[in-house]
Amino acid sequence: MPNVRVRSITLSPLLPLVKDYYVQRAQVPGTLLITEGTLVAPKASGIPALPEIWTEEQISAWTEIVDGVHAQGSYIYMQIAAFGRQASPDYLKSRDSTFPHVGPSALPHAPGAPIPREMTKEEINEHIEFFGIGAANAVHKAGFDGVEIHGANGFLVDQFLQSTSNVRDDEYGGSVQERVKFPLEVIERVVKEVGADRVGIRLSPWNRSAGMGMEDPIPTFSYLTTRVKELYPDFAFIHVVKARVDGFTDLLPEDIKEFETNDFIRNIWAPKPLISAGGYTRESGMETADEKGDLIAYGRWFISNPDLVTRLEKNIPFSKYDRSTFYIPGDASGVGYTDYAFAQ
């Protein structure tokens, strides 16, 4: 986890089965769950049926989910996110006719996609504040153990980092230091609200989807990692996505260049906690944990195996997942969501 599941009703409290989904996967005490990307403000949204964390109704619904996870003796972080240029302009207008479609620069996330307007400095500051408020709502009101800033997969923080989406000529774009400025200010604002030991960030240096895939991400992500380590000795973790995962697609080994690894982040960040995600099996996960000391995140396998932790411990084969049921916006049936079987 985290995995986008689009089962939430955007303008109403979360569906009750969302609680079942998380509680099912928290049944082994000590499990750490990270929610799917949860939007920090209406202006930061982008498509229907994603979870949100700004109204009292939403906070109350999340509190019930958090309490259910904690009752199992497990932990849960909220991944907080903003869409930026990936948002649907029509969806934003359907929520409020004044909501703009914006990004770091006036560049679309894909050929033929709508072109966002370049964010003003006022809008940049506004989004930084959104992240701070979202973190406070999650930790201080809903009771989450911490938050993970979504800085991966072409969402807003990632858009500022990458030269393919950020060609600004002010202090928020251009050099490595300038492209890292917005992510660092988001981190600073979130840390101010909840403390560094309750904050992590997810990064995908090698992701090519959603118009990402800068030619050489190593200098940018090295600088970000170094600065976070220097500024926040108690920062909870960095969560990296392997090069083999490209958005929602798995690349073939021959499509991945030899240098496309996250070892550069791992080496800078050591000995602090690093979470690694990217289609791990039981065997490859254990091998990476043993050889590199990473914490291993499981996403898709956790969808189809609510008792994944037990299966990992006892070497029980994984149940296969059904991709066709990954994303069913607003569905309340539980199909492909809460109906996967536990091993006997």
What residue ranges belong to the model's regions?
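Flavin-dependent oxidoreductase catalytic cores
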Residues: 1-344
